Regions:
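Alpha/beta-hydrolase fold catalytic core
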Residues: 1-48, 69-72, 98, 109-110
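Active-site loop/oxyanion-hole signature of alpha/beta-hydrolase fold enzymes
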Residues: 21, 26-29, 36, 76-116
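Soluble, non-transmembrane catalytic domains of enzymes that act on hydrophobic metabolites at membranes
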Residues: 33-36, 67, 123, 131
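Conserved HGGG/HGGXW glycine-rich cap/lid loop of the alpha/beta-hydrolase fold
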Residues: 37-84
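Short, conserved clusters of charged catalytic residues that mark active-site
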Residues: 56-60, 95, 123
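Short, hydrophobic alpha-helix immediately C-terminal to the catalytic nucleophile
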Residues: 62, 101, 126-130
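Glycine-rich, phosphate-binding/catalytic loops in enzymes
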Residues: 65-68, 91-93, 133
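Conserved hydrolase catalytic core segment
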Residues: 111-134
Length: 134
């Protein structure tokens, strides 16, 4: 279940930035991800992917959404089993890196992207960067 309008307004996030995305997974399942997205001003806007750690979630990045220039598209997902994303149970490091690939594919995001990460989101960002050096 996604956050309520009131929860979003309490942290200064416009409700239209919050969505639930159905993501086909590399494991054959489809998972519901909660994602905060601020669109860029153009279709070709640079993309900043914000990966939280534990025990936080996408709301950690709400201030950054207001600080970065409006011509940047910002995406901050709740990892699976965290925040408002679907609870899938334990997931390995390798699986979580593939989960990020699945999400970006579902959002039609191509490289290059910038990644901002916190806590073990940094380890996931490194895993993604190793698999996608461009």
């Amino acid at each position: 279940m996604p956050p309520s309008r009131r929860e979003l307004e309490n942290i200064g996030v416009p409700p239209e930035w919050s969505s639930v995305v159905e993501v086909p997974s590399h494991d054959g399942a489809t998972y519901s991800w909660h994602v905060l997205q601020r669109p860029g001003t153009s279709e070709n806007a640079p993309v900043v992917l914000c990966l939280h750690g534990n025990p936080t979630w996408s709301f950690l990045w709400s201030r950054l959404f207001h600080e970065l220039k409006s011509d940047v598209r910002i995406i901050a997902p709740d990892h699976l089993s965290m925040g408002y994303s679907q609870n899938t149970g334990p997931r390995s490091y390798e699986t979580r890196v593939k989960d990020i690939e699945d999400l970006l594919r579902a959002l039609s995001i191509s490289e290059p992207i910038w990644i901002v990460a916190q806590d073990w989101g940094g380890a996931l960002a490194m895993g993604y960067a190793v698999a996608h050096p461009n």
